[in-house]
Amino acid sequence: MRLCDKDIEQYLDDEKIIIEPKPDSSMISGVSVDIRLGNEFRVFQDHTAPYIDLSAPKGEVQEAMNSIMSDEIFIADGDAFFLHPGELALAVTYESVTLPDNIVGWLDGRSSLARLGLMVHVTAHRIDPGWSGQIVLEFYNSGKLPLALRPKMKIAALNFETMSSSAARPYNKREDAKYRDQKGAVASRISQDEKVNK
């Protein structure tokens, strides 16, 4: 069951859901909380790699990732990050979110931004029960013009769904949780995935 605005406010007041800094009531709508853009970004650099073999040995995957991903880029408040048409970039939410073991979060883009071609997540919009940290955004500009994105602008909406019971394996207790307590525009850690050989 999705939480309505009254429930979201109560869960925030009771600290069952923690969003830092805590949103004021103007950021809470009927079923969601507005989330703002943070200051950290990463882009894919010019490179000569013909491809990344995602099933290669971990070291090779990490080496390929290091060759294409930029260091973290900090954009000061008031300045803009420009996302060009056809470009993929990573960013991070201004807010940090902590969920209990019995709530899953869903991050959705804003319709007004989507109508300009901005996707705020490529496929990863689920926030697992037990999550704690900032949320990395996978930006893609499918429009025709560059988009100027500024820290602290409203960038997405987060809504919450109660589960039938608490998760037996919440994110914060999993040994394979690669993004636990995430801060900043963390690049893919796919090289840490366990290889499954069948």
Swiss-Prot record:
Pathway of action: Pyrimidine metabolism; dUMP biosynthesis; dUMP from dCTP (dUTP route): step 1/2
Alphabetic keyword roster: Hydrolase, Nucleotide metabolism, Nucleotide-binding
EC numbers on record: 3.5.4.13
InterPro entries (alphabetical): dCTP_deaminase (IPR011962), dUTPase-like_sf (IPR036157), dUTPase_trimeric (IPR033704)
One of the GO BP terms on file: nucleobase-containing small molecule interconversion
Residues forming the catalytic site: 138
Pfam families (UniProt xref): DCD
Record field: catalytic activity: dCTP + H2O + H(+) = dUTP + NH4(+)
One function term, GO molecular function aspect: nucleotide binding
Compositionally biased region (Basic and acidic residues): 172-183
Gene3D superfamilies: 2.70.40.10
Residues holding dCTP: 110-115, 128, 136-138, 171, 178, 182
Family per similarity comment: Belongs to the dCTP deaminase family.
Oligomer and partners: Homotrimer.
PANTHER family reported in the protein's UniProt record: DCTP DEAMINASE
Classification via HAMAP family: dCTP_deaminase
Function: Catalyzes the deamination of dCTP to dUTP.
Protein name: dCTP deaminase
Species this protein is from: Colwellia psychrerythraea (strain 34H / ATCC BAA-681)
